[in-house]
Amino acid sequence: MSLIPITFYFLFLFFSNFRGVFAVPNIHLCHFEQRDALLEFKNEFKIKKPCFGCPSPLKTKSWENGSDCCHWDGITCDAKTGEVIEIDLMCSCLHGWFHSNSNLSMLQNFHFLTTLDLSYNHLSGQISSSIGNLSHLTTLDLSGNNFSGWIPSSLGNLFHLTSLHLYDNNFGGEIPSSLGNLSYLTFLDLSTNNFVGEIPSSFGSLNQLSILRLDNNKLSGNLPLEVINLTKLSEISLSHNQFTGTLPPNITSLSILESFSASGNNFVGTIPSSLFTIPSITLIFLDNNQLSGTLEFGNISSPSNLLVLQLGGNNLRGPIPTSISRLVNLRTLDLSHFNIQGQVDFNIFSHLKLLGNLYLSHSNTTTTIDLNAVLSCFKMLISLDLSGNHVLVTNKSSVSDPPLGLIGSLNLSGCGITEFPDILRTQRQMRTLDISNNKIKGQVPSWLLLQLEYMHISNNNFIGFERSTKLEKTVVPKPSMKHFFGSNNNFSGKIPSFICSLRSLIILDLSNNNFSGAIPPCVGKFKSTLSDLNLRRNRLSGSLPKTIIKSLRSLDVSHNELEGKLPRSLIHFSTLEVLNVESNRINDTFPFWLSSLKKLQVLVLRSNAFHGRIHKTRFPKLRIIDISRNHFNGTLPSDCFVEWTGMHSLEKNEDRFNEKYMGSGYYHDSMVLMNKGLEMELVRILKIYTALDFSGNKFEGEIPRSIGLLKELHILNLSSNGFTGHIPSSMGNLRELESLDVSRNKLSGEIPQELGNLSYLAYMNFSHNQLVGQVPGGTQFRTQSASSFEENLGLCGRPLEECRVVHEPTPSGESETLESEQVLSWIAAAIGFTPGIVLGLTIGHIVLSSKPRWFFKVLYINNSRRRRRTRSEKS
């Protein structure tokens, strides 16, 4: 036997035995039907940037037909079977409607799916019960979307689930008790939704639960004792709900609890001292409840691990216990609105060497707090709030032992201070200072403007700025000032030019002073930063600058001496929401061109010299308009209010973190409005507030019926004009109306009976018109005084004299209402019909040109029949 065949034989045996080692992997590892399902799922949604500022790339970009889905971003397959087991599309910029039946049916092709993560996209829709069929899921994360509706109870069928994240959606209804079936669950996050009702008692079966987050919902009831028996809990977050009752005294059973958060609820009773004795506790948030009694820390372990203790905004009373000194690791302490009823002994804080944030506002102390002593007591303090207390400021020529300059934020608002604290000069790290609502006189120190980012000096007696001429020559390459509040002082002269150096300004409020001269044109330098500019109630003259500030959200120059026209450059203020030029000398026509500002919500032109007619225009978001006390004239077009859709219905606010008021956390818009016959100052403007004031002009003709489209209107004032004709019955559609004033016009006819059905209408004035007939009998009308109807010789009925002859209601009233509603519908639809009219005229021309004889024959016969029928009916 030759050597060569034997060699090949042994090589064959070798490779046969080790073929598994050298086997080439399959080219297509994933299953074709799963790949197709993923591609179909991808095509259901659009991809739009940006999305939540997520740094991750677009995962579905790698999803292409013909490629191996197991190699796609966000997809994980089982190495042996090729089955897709994980789908992670977090931060994938997916936009669209999640069709539960179709989308979930696609996902049901993945029989062994363990992880489904669709968090932080822009997905809307509801979750159907078929999600319960994904029986192998261990992790489900739908956080950071716009999902709504109820949670399907079938989620309780996902018995292998260990993590369920539904944070930051719009889910509502009650939390299904079936979630108590998830016995392997360790992480449950239902926070920031709209859940109502109580915490299900079935949660007591979640024995493996470590983290429970239910904050920012509308949950109510008591904290179930079953939850306190979940001994593996390390975090409980219940903040910002409507929970009531007392905190359970046996909370010590949660022996490994690290964080307990229940802020912003309605809990009552005392704080159980046992809470502070849990060795592992590091964070306690109980602020803004109705807790009462004295504060007791019990037998605190030494050293305590507690880092944050927030108890402010309750009804706690008595002295601060000396045992607080055992909280040696404390970084943040909030005892604001604590009714101390005595002297604050800051020596009890001497052992809190690491304390960085101390909040003692409105402590109801019987003695004065020495600011110098407090600052000297704490070596690591970064933030200090003593607002609403009596604070002593001692300005000495020298400080023997100046405190360390570590304070970054200091709040001394409303502390009765009469002179500026010199000790603040040593605080080189200070970036936020609030000394508003005091009695400080003199000049504002120049160094503040070069160091601070936030300065609130409003409601004092300042008269100027220290060494302003020197400051104006100072070169500040990177000015830090972002928020400057200087309202309600005694500043005078021109607005100092150093303001122009503060090019990082976001908010500038110099309202209610005595500034004069022109508005500095340099405000245009803030074109990319300035959001809110308030110069109300000064003596500023000249015209509004023509510079463009694209970032501006609110502009208030009311109650000055400005003249000229509104600058047409305002058309480029694309982010403008509020424009208030009330009580100036502006002489211009109505600014129809402002309709291009898509975000404009408040427009106040009151008490100027505006003139001319009002034509139909489009204001999609306008909710408050006041053009009273001007010289507008002419008739209002019948479709005047058709495209004022911001008052037709309120937009659904998808962002629940938005403020209820116009403005931001630092600044809120304000204005003066005629309401119920009186001038009312709105210190804050509710976002749901709507008002229309056209009073004190020279309008004539009929009140447009399209006014009935403004169904969200709260205030309507058309008084002191020359309106004629009947009050439109369409006003009966103004279901939210609280104040109605049509006095001092030339209106005739009867007051529409439909107005009697407006249950919120608390104030009305129909006086000084030519109205006749019986006053409507609604409850709101009966409570009005006779002065609301005076100088209408034809009116009768309560609260006026009884009508001598009571006429049966004519059917014309009902028909007029029906006709009014039909007119409003046709007016609102007219915009969409315009292209159809053009098309119809074109087709008509073709028909008439090609078939005139038969067309006129048919038309003539039909018209003849109608005329004969009409004559016979009349005879």
Swiss-Prot record:
Domain of life: Eukaryota
SMART domains per the UniProt record, alphabetical: LRR_TYP
SUPFAM superfamilies attached to this UniProt entry: L domain-like (SSF52058)
Extracellular compartment spans: 24-822
UniProt keyword annotation of Cell membrane present: yes
Location within or outside the cell: Cell membrane
Annotated keywords: Cell membrane, Glycoprotein, Leucine-rich repeat, Membrane, Receptor, Repeat, Signal, Transmembrane, Transmembrane helix
Signal peptide interval: 1-23
Membrane topology: Single-pass type I membrane protein
LRR repeat copies, ranges: 110-133, 134-157, 159-182, 183-205, 206-230, 231-254, 256-278, 280-302, 303-327, 329-351, 352-377, 378-401, 404-427, 428-451, 455-477, 479-502, 503-528, 530-549, 550-573, 575-596, 597-619, 620-643, 686-710, 711-734, 735-758, 760-783
Keyword Chaperone recorded: no
Glycosylation sites: 65, 103, 133, 146, 181, 229, 250, 299, 364, 395, 411, 490, 514, 587, 633, 717, 757, 765
Transmembrane segments: 823-843
Pfam families recorded: LRR_1 (PF00560), LRR_14 (PF23598), LRR_6 (PF13516), LRR_8 (PF13855), LRRNT_2 (PF08263)
Cytoplasmic side: 844-875
GO cellular component: plasma membrane
Family affiliation: Belongs to the RLP family.
Identification of the protein by name: Receptor-like protein 33
Organism encoding this protein: Arabidopsis thaliana (Mouse-ear cress)
Gene that encodes the chain: RLP33
